[in-house]
Amino acid sequence: MFGYVTVCEPELKVKDLKKYKAYYCGLCHVLKEEYGFIGQMTLTYDMTFAIILLSSLYESDTRADMHCCKVHPVKKQIMLTNEITSYGAAMNVLMAYYHMEDDWQDERKVSSLTVKTMLRGKVKKIMEQYPRQSRAIESALNELSVCEREGSTDLDKTAGCFGKLMEELFLYKKDRWEETLRKMGFFMGKFIY
């Protein structure tokens, strides 16, 4: 359920695609800076979407930088970052950790156990920094796991579990946007599931 959101490039204007890629590069950079190479390996489009949405909503002061990296070693790329990029990076790592946990529990993938173990210390710090989101994500995924183990055919119930998760993830801070962001996150989560 995590890592399924992608951008439909043919439908975006060139300027919008450039902006999307710049936020994606910004997230990648922050993941590396704050969580190291293993954090960078968790990069997804899902959080890029959330960062763009929240940055637009909160009109965060966004910094534009040019940089080269291993993926783009020759031509410098535009990188957009702000305070919400750090939040998105933390949520990205947290979601990746639980994704690895799920893969380990379901399929006994050694690679998932390895990555999960490497992320454990970083995730502990994220849980301390974002306790509300951490508890909600863990609770929703546990509820979803129970539904899956029971072989639940109630799609609304199982999709609702992931909706609850996304509802909390979209809620960057409790303010006047809380109700709107909760609804948006909930229904987007149900749709993704």
Each language-model region and where it sits:
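Acidic catalytic motifs of isoprenoid enzymes
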Residues: M1-K164, E168-M184, Y193
